[in-house]
């Protein structure tokens, strides 16, 4: 995206580019992408996909794929479909394997993989305005954030989560049949299937009292603000917004379409299941303030899980640090 942002003002950049939606805020701020009207096709896309291509009330591209993490179950070990975190742990323990549930964290933390659990405590990363768009006002403070931090500490004390569990360790443990459940995305599910595992993709169970909403990423086509082929670009965008084009991209890319009706017709059960999880997920913020969040957020989660910081005080310090970073720009 840096190269695109540099090239567009000179007139040398491409007419179209494909990137994740979380680049949208920066691209609009730099004036390098043009609005794109989805027209009547707008209603065919998942709400989360439409939100993804919308910034300050304008749509800026055509979404084509949605992606999120989900709960993945080893069907050889259990056929339970837990709706709460505690039920999942209890179910996993009955299998007798080393890990009732495993999730990657690493020494820098992993807010992305843990976000579904965090939202179940009513602690989304940012507040939203009346139109449902994110503001730069943090929503992770208050009782919801404290409750999530306290839960993190309890799971760390219980040995369920740990900064010592990296992505590779979690993946290998699941591949080796040492874990009943994990939270991961389609990239690892493909590897599980290639290894011959029988798995199912399920909604993430709630650890708190609300629904678990993992982050949803959306892949989209953008149009350069300096494009000289606007008529051809419009025709191409109109085609990309048809079910036919969406179905072809889904087959080629192996990712759930941004159109639920297209994903529902797939003969790939994983695509169908990930699509359903994404539909009820939370769009990953595309606002510039998001760049100030990750480092403090992840480090604090890891420290709380391993007992290096007290939950309430550590979380409050994190919120203060993030707010200061956002204010300093």
Regions found by a protein language model. Give the residues of each.
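Glycine-centered hinge/linker elements that transmit conformational signals in sensory
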Residues: 132-164
